[in-house]
Regions:
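Hot-dog-fold acyl-thioester-processing enzymes
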Residues: 1-87, 150-154
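Short alpha-helix capping/helix-loop boundary micro-motifs
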Residues: 89-93
């Protein structure tokens, strides 16, 4: 079944907030094998001008799992069959580093749904903001729904 094109342009309101902790950042840095001291040592981060440890840029992917319940892909009316979905790509535009102590929330928008051969490509844009409204990052994620494009008459 094709993905519901009526979702293109649909906005999803701010999610519940998530407080970023030092341990969240440290665990992620260890998991990806990045030894940057600014990710684990507050003194090293402060020496670089940050208020606390900072997160690796790709840390924001973990927030997608926390914010996911408010996302378009959780909406049954979208018609997305998770058993057919693979991750396409992820892009990050960081407006400032994510720091321990940040309280973040996100809004999402379905930017595009289109056929690519027998598959469908869905692009979602997420705006991540701090509690004070400061824009932290803009992410763009694409997912591929395999074999669900509308069949074309030959």
């Amino acid at each position: 079944m094709p993905i519901n094109r009526e979702f293109i342009g649909r906005d999803y309101p701010a999610s519940e907030t998530f407080e970023v902790g030092r341990e969240h950042i440290r665990s992620f840095a260890v998991a990806i094998g990045d030894p940057n001291p600014a990710y684990v040592d507050p003194a090293a981060a402060r020496a670089l001008g940050h208020p606390d440890v900072i997160a690796p840029p790709t840390f924001l992917t973990t927030l997608g799992f926390r914010f996911g319940l408010d996302s378009p892909v959780a909406d049954a009316a979208l018609g997305l069959d998770y058993s057919l979905v693979v991750h396409g790509e992820q892009q990050f535009e960081l407006h400032r580093p994510v720091c321990a102590g940040d309280v973040l929330s996100s809004t999402q928008r379905v930017e595009q749904i289109k056929d690519v051969g027998r598959n469908e490509l869905m692009v979602m844009v997420t705006e991540v903001t701090a509690a004070d409204g400061e824009k932290v990052a803009t992410t763009r994620m694409s997912i591929v729904s395999r074999g669900t494009a509308a069949k074309k008459d030959a």
